[in-house]
């Protein structure tokens, strides 16, 4: 029997936290395999980069590299597919071994017929000792690449709408739509109240796509607006009086 573990988007991981904790209990202790950087963005015709894979354990590991294209749904769920034909990728290697307590570097060169473009380079890691349940384990670690034009998303291309509270009344939902052809990234988000802000993580804003985000709301203090921080500007979406006085679940 084998156990295959992949990373996933943050909200999906939160929903599956109990299952993930169960799965991670099968991993050998003292192992904290790392891929870095996790994300790389390039504003050049040819993206030239490298990936470092770290094996801090005491046994050698085998690694198989698999590039994939992907798309992201409104709720942040990722769907993978074979690498698009419009992306040309050269890798220094497709498989290798990492000795114990050492690192291995992969070098790559990528270009795309149309920009913006994005893809992921997955490192599928094996060689772990079988755990007490007799399972073989493979761990998938992603390195995501964005090849972008110099022009990023325009402020007028982004539309924010409030969708109200979630069913469990612990979050407020918003849709963020990019109506333009350029890629952008929300570096962070904030739900603003009279006495302060509730921060939340950022997310990519893909061309001609909508993303639904959920931000935790705490206490009964009225909320006044949603704020997105992008590289060159910020967006503010005021809340209506009815939305602002919504009481979150304790």
Q: What residue ranges belong to the model's regions?
A:
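Short Pro-Gly-centered flexible turn/kink motifs
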Residues: 96-110, 208-216
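Short, solvent-exposed loop/turn segments enriched in Ser/Thr/Gly
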Residues: 43-50, 104-105, 115-120, 139, ...
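Terminal connector regions
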Residues: 112-152, 222-250
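Short, acidic/polar linear motifs in exposed loop/turn regions
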Residues: 57-59, 177-182
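Beta-sheet-dominated interaction scaffolds and their linkers
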Residues: 32-58, 95, 154-169, 202
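N-terminal secretory signal peptides that target proteins for export/translocation
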Residues: 1-13
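Surface-exposed binding patches on compact interaction domains or structured appendages
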Residues: 57-103, 194-196
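Bacterial N-terminal signal peptides
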Residues: 18-26
């Amino acid at each position: 029997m084998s156990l295959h573990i992949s990373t996933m988007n943050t909200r999906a991981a939160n929903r599956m936290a109990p299952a993930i904790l169960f799965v991670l209990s099968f991993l050998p202790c003292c192992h904290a395999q790392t891929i870095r950087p996790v994300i790389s963005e390039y504003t050049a015709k040819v993206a030239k980069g490298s990936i470092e894979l770290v094996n801090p354990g005491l046994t050698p590991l085998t690694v198989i590299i698999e590039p994939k294209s992907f798309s992201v749904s409104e709720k942040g769920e990722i769907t993978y597919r074979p690498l698009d034909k419009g992306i040309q990728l050269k890798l220094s290697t497709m498989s290798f071994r990492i000795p114990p307590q050492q690192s291995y570097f992969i070098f790559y060169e990528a270009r795309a017929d149309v920009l913006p473009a994005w893809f992921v380079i997955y490192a599928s890691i094996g060689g772990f000792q079988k755990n007490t349940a007799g399972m073989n384990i493979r761990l998938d670690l992603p390195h995501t690449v964005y090849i972008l034009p110099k022009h990023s998303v325009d402020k007028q291309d982004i539309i924010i709408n409030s969708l109200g509270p979630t069913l469990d009344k612990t979050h407020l939902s918003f849709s963020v739509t990019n109506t333009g052809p350029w890629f952008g990234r929300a570096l962070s988000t904030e739900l603003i109240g009279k006495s302060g802000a509730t921060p939340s993580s950022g997310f990519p804003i893909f061309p001609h796509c909508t993303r639904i985000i959920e931000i935790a709301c705490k206490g009964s203090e009225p909320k006044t607006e949603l704020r997105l921080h992008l590289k060159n500007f910020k967006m503010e979406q005021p809340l209506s009086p009815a939305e602002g006085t919504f009481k979150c679940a304790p």
